[in-house]
Amino acid sequence: MIRIGQGYDVHKLAYDRELIVGGIKIPYEKGLLGHSDADVLLHAITDAIIGAIGAGDIGHFFPDTDMAFKDADSAELLEEIWQKVEADGFRLGNLDATIIAEKPKMAPYVEQMKLRIAELLHADSAQVNVKATTTEKLGFTGRKEGIASLAVVLLEK
């Protein structure tokens, strides 16, 4: 059986926050604002995986109204979902994700993100693709107000 899921997330950039994308700390003057650590890439991936198994969305499992998830490490949230996926007999076929950000430039960190995500999903790094793009200074990402991410995942059983 093959299942496909897609995920999307966006977070606002804010001062006095660490910038964590794809499980990697990125030096920058701002970080992403959110209930958890606001890792926009891991949130999109988690949402894609949840969608692939037909179990709703990330907010169902980790509501932003629950203080248990305040400042939560998004890698731990992804691992929790991935344990459920593996227990159901699925494994990663492949994952393709895009980070949309004007600043900071993500390209120098993409390989580290790819390796970290593969580790979290018990997969080979060849099964994970992460890329970064801009919106050519258009929209909220172009104005450097936030960062968005898209993810598509294929699971196999």
From Swiss-Prot:
MF annotations from Gene Ontology: 2-C-methyl-D-erythritol 2,4-cyclodiphosphate synthase activity; metal ion binding
Keyword vocabulary terms for this entry: Isoprene biosynthesis, Lyase, Metal-binding
Enzyme type, top EC level: lyase
SUPFAM superfamilies in UniProt: IpsF-like
Gene Ontology biological process: isopentenyl diphosphate biosynthetic process, methylerythritol 4-phosphate pathway; terpenoid biosynthetic process
Binding, a divalent metal cation: D9, H11, H43
Pathway involvement of the protein, from the record: Isoprenoid biosynthesis; isopentenyl diphosphate biosynthesis via DXP pathway; isopentenyl diphosphate from 1-deoxy-D-xylulose 5-phosphate: step 4/6
Cofactors required: a divalent metal cation
Binding-site list for 4-CDP-2-C-methyl-D-erythritol 2-phosphate: 9-11, 35-36, 57-59, 62-66, 101-107, 133-136, 140, 143
Residues the UniProt record annotates as site (Transition state stabilizer): H35, T134
PROSITE patterns for this protein: ISPF
Family: Belongs to the IspF family.
Assembly with partners or alone: Homotrimer.
Annotated function: Involved in the biosynthesis of isopentenyl diphosphate (IPP) and dimethylallyl diphosphate (DMAPP), two major building blocks of isoprenoid compounds. Catalyzes the conversion of 4-diphosphocytidyl-2-C-methyl-D-erythritol 2-phosphate (CDP-ME2P) to 2-C-methyl-D-erythritol 2,4-cyclodiphosphate (ME-CPP) with a corresponding release of cytidine 5-monophosphate (CMP).
Protein name in the entry: 2-C-methyl-D-erythritol 2,4-cyclodiphosphate synthase
Protein's organism: Listeria monocytogenes serotype 4b (strain CLIP80459)
Organism placement in taxonomy: Bacteria, Bacillati, Bacillota, Bacilli, Bacillales
Gene that this sequence comes from: ispF
